[in-house]
């Protein structure tokens, strides 16, 4: 397979993450729901389903996809449900989580036959970037006033608390969970379930997985609740690459390799959060790897190679599964990467191609 660009999902690496999730579930008793906002490539769901309990969503379409393609337990969350969405959402969901007391007041009766929850905002997080900080000033994400939370009791069976972001520090997780226990314990002990959301980087290298499992079990036992986690990035970290080809090489005081992809169109989160792509760093031949759109800052980052690059060379951009395929777009009309899976036997299945007809159909 030579046609680039394409996202290449590695089945063996994905299973490694899944086995860590399975180990955490077994030791802690917690349930794990795939966060579709991060990764929703449903052709990989058959690999993941044996190791996870279901999906959680942030919109009606994600919810529908989770029910249709993943099955098992399906949680529905949205910052705001609309009148023309709520009946369909309730039809797909096992649990529906409202973002605010006003949404619970408005739609709670419609959802009385399924489990209802509310988003609890503890007013702190591990995010170091304001754009992704649910505890930022004037946050619209969840309720934190105990009087408003009390007003929901009797109508909800659980809460969702999403406050971690790429948190690989177990001690910090432990400390912040203790704060939640101290401040909201009187409410938690009257619930049946608590989702601690995603953002816990427990599949990363050297993470103390058993310590996390034991802490989750203690939380569950102390408050008598079923714990849920919503791993997105933790499910798919280091499981895919974006495969690109060098189209041109420039030297404008710095060697630049232009590839057949775009950070704006194909790895947008890196641009948003001012991060560089994970590029090769072996060798003494250094190049800036740049995309092919007209955006001046369409730059993946600097890479090093053991020998000079040539037009036609392939480059693998690592860790390209999370928040990539769900955010890819048609900026400049640049060809959208195909999606492929490298199977455990080494074979590669090219599972989705995108064509001009897809581009045209996305417009009007």
Residue map of PLM features:
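Active-site-proximal beta-alpha core segment in soluble small-molecule metabolic enzymes
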Residues: 30-193, 207, 215
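Glycine-rich beta-strand-to-loop/alpha-helix junction loops that act as flexible
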Residues: 35, 164, 194-203, 231-234
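Charged (often Lys/Glu-rich) extended helix/loop segments that serve as interaction or gating elements
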Residues: 226-364
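Anionic group-transfer/hydrolysis microenvironments
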Residues: 12, 101, 121-123, 162, ...
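Acidic/histidine-enriched ion/cofactor-binding microenvironments in catalytic or ligand-binding pockets
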Residues: 182, 186-191, 211-222, 303-316
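Short glycine/threonine-rich loop-to-helix capping motif typified by GTGT followed
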Residues: 169-174, 203-212, 238-248, 304-305
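N-terminal capping/small domains of soluble enzymes
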Residues: 1-71, 77, 81, 262, ...
């Amino acid at each position: 397979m030579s046609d680039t660009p394409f996202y290449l999902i590695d089945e063996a690496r994905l299973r490694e993450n899944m086995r860590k999730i399975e180990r955490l579930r077994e030791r802690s008793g917690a349930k794990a729901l795939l966060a579709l906002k991060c990764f929703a490539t449903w052709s990989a769901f058959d690999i993941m389903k044996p190791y996870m309990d279901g999906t959680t969503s942030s919109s009606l379409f994600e919810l529908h996809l989770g029910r249709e393609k993943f099955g098992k337990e399906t949680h529905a969350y949205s910052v705001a449900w609309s009148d023309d969405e709520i009946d369909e959402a309730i039809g797909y969901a096992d649990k529906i989580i409202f973002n605010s007391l006003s949404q619970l007041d408005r739609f709670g009766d419609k959802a009385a036959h399924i489990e209802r929850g509310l988003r609890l905002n503890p007013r702190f997080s591990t995010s170091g970037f304001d754009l992704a900080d649910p505890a930022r000033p004037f946050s619209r994400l969840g309720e934190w006033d105990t009087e408003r939370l009390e007003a929901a009791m009797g109508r909800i069976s659980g809460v969702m608390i999403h406050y971690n972001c790429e948190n690989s520090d177990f001690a910090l997780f432990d400390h912040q969970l203790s704060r939640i226990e101290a401040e909201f314990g009187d409410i938690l002990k009257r619930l049946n379930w608590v989702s601690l959301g995603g953002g816990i980087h427990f599949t990363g290298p050297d993470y103390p997985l058993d310590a996390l499992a034991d802490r989750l079990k203690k939380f569950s036992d102390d408050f008598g609740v079923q714990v849920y986690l919503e791993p997105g990035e933790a499910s798919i970290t280091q499981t895919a690459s974006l495969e690109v080809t060098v189209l041109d090489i420039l030297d404008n005081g710095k060697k630049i390799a232009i590839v057949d992809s775009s950070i704006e169109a194909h790895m947008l989160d890196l641009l948003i959060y001012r991060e560089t792509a994970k590029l090769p760093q072996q060798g003494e031949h250094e190049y800036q790897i740049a995309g092919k759109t007209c955006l001046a800052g369409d730059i993946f980052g600097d890479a090093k190679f053991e020998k000079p690059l040539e037009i036609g060379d392939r480059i693998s951009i690592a860790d390209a599964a999370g928040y990539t395929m769900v955010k890819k777009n048609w900026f400049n009309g640049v060809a959208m990467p195909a999606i492929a899976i490298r199977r455990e036997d080494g074979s590669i299945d090219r599972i989705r191609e995108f064509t001009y007809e897809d581009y045209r159909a996305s417009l009007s």
